Amino acid sequence: MAASIATRLAPVAIFVIVAGFFAVALRSGDPSRLPSPLIGKPAPQAAFPALDGLLAEGKTVPGFATADLAKGKVSIVNFWASWCAPCVDEHPMLAELKMSAGVDVYGVAYKDDGAASRRFLGRYGNPFTAVGADDSGRRGIDWGVYGTPETFVVNGRGEIVFKHVGPMTAESIKLKMLPAIAAAKNSSAQKS
């Protein structure tokens, strides 16, 4: 009888131990900084077509390609969507980051409807230098995007140097994004 109780409790004990390991792993580390195998490597080759019908000052807002990110200037690439509630909270931070850091900010409407993306930018403003569409999410997969928002710092050579997962806050901009941008600018200046 003692053996049958031990036999029945063994799977429960194993489950509790494994669940404990997962709980510890989930609580440790910064969830906004998932490791990316792309750090230090060239941004994946992709062309993000312009968001149909998006205008700024009467002119079509262009899409962009990876080559646009390798023209000697540090830039930011932000994957967002109109259906993403944290993207609404983060959106004003993008304009602030563009101004304070003096970088171009490229936006990717990720797995989003074009009309909904245009309404979002009409309502909250357009901080982007260019806005590309990734309707299917295939290009985002190449970039290692898990969801929205996700933001990348790309150095002047077109290499990804930092990835931020989740919405940026004033604190994350100050403690993470601005130092990553400064390091990328210094690195680009030294290689010139």
Residue ranges and their predicted role:
Residues M1-L54, S192:
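N-terminal targeting signals for export/organelle localization
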Residues F79-E96:
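Conserved redox-active cysteine motifs that mediate thiol-disulfide chemistry
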Residues A81-A85, K111-A115, G137-R139, P167-A170:
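Solvent-exposed loop/turn segments at secondary-structure junctions
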Residues R8, G122-P127, A133-K185, K191-S192:
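Thiol/disulfide oxidoreductase modules built on the thioredoxin-like
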Residues M99-S136:
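Conserved segment of the thioredoxin-like fold in thiol-based oxidoreductases
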Residues I76-V77, V105, T151:
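Hydrophobic beta-strand anchors of alpha/beta hydrolase catalytic cores
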Residues G72-S75, W80-W83, G147:
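Short pre-active-site segment immediately N-terminal to redox-active cysteine/selenocysteine motifs
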Residues A46-S75:
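A short beta-strand-turn-helix
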